[in-house]
Regions:
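Conserved structural motif at the start of ABC-family nucleotide-binding domains
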Residues: 2, 16-19
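The feature captures the beta-strand-to-loop junction immediately N-terminal to the Walker
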Residues: 33-35
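Helix-to-loop junction immediately C-terminal to a conserved catalytic motif
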Residues: 48
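Conserved ABC transporter NBD signature motif
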Residues: 56-63, 109
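ABC ATPase NBD coupling module
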Residues: 64-79, 223
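Q-loop/switch helix immediately C-terminal to the Walker
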Residues: 84, 90-106
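ABC ATPase C-loop
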Residues: 146-147
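Walker B catalytic motif
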Residues: 158-159
Length: 237
């Protein structure tokens, strides 16, 4: 279980996160959503270890990982995909997946991972990770490199960024398939409705605080009730 206790973070004297506390159970598909500037991506970076909170604790299975650097945090079981996938000149897709796995794997195993993210493995396994690949292709390759680690917690920061509609629809299929064979906790930072629809749990951030959180069904019920109340109030005016 991943637990955040009273996480606060400032940048340039502006409060980005304000006393955020969360408990994320194992084997859950969690979407953190909210308006632009709500602190979503900063929270992802703090979980990853890219940013360090000004105060608060981060616990993974009861162990305090708050002060662990990004490489040690990865070793402890935190996997992540960047907002924009990184291109590595001279490195093939197979090289990246092998490095990400942290162990010796063969091309057959790499091809199996690529197939799970919707790529024709034989066409991609030996390709160089370069500008010749589209944003959607890079995104799926990065997801494959994250999936091969079998991390306890995997964080995706706005995976829909920079890809076209066709690639986005393929991405939804990849995440839907991942959810069905879920091992560990998957956290996705997104405000896309199609991604929200495949979540187990939703967390809504606003102005750096947790405004609402719960199961997808609970959250949708709250939204519908809020809308109904607004209509009643409007009708009484």
């Amino acid at each position: 279980m991943l637990e955040l206790k009273n996480i606060s973070f400032k940048r340039d004297n502006k409060q980005i996160l304000d006393n955020v506390s969360l408990k994320l159970d194992d084997d859950k598909f969690v979407v953190i959503t909210g308006p632009n500037g709500s602190g979503k991506s900063t929270l992802a970076k703090i979980i990853m270890g890219i940013e360090k909170p000004d105060s608060g604790q981060i616990l993974l299975d009861g162990k305090d990982i708050t002060n662990l650097p990004i490489n040690e945090r990865a070793k402890s079981g935190i996997g992540f995909a960047f907002h924009q996938p990184v291109r590595f000149k001279g490195i093939t897709v197979f090289d990246l997946i092998k490095l990400s796995a942290g162990k010796d794997i063969n091309k057959g195993e790499a091809c199996n991972i690529l197939s799970k993210v919707g790529l024709c493995a034989n066409e991609y396994v030996d390709r160089e990770i370069s500008s010749a690949l589209s944003g959607g292709e890079l995104k799926r390759i990065e997801i494959a490199s994250v999936a091969v680690r079998n991390s306890k917690v995997t964080v995706f920061d706005e995976p829909e960024a920079g890809i076209d509609l066709w690639s986005f629809n393929n991405l939804i299929k990849v995440f839907t398939d991942m959810r069905q064979s879920l091992k560990g906790t998957t956290i996705i930072i997104s405000h896309q409705e199609k991604i929200i629809n495949i979540a187990d749990d939703l967390i809504l951030l606003a102005d750096g605080k947790v405004e609402k959180m719960g199961s997808k069904e609970e959250m949708f019920d709250k939204v519908q009730k809020d809308r109904a109340c607004c209509k009643l109030e409007g009708g009484n005016n």
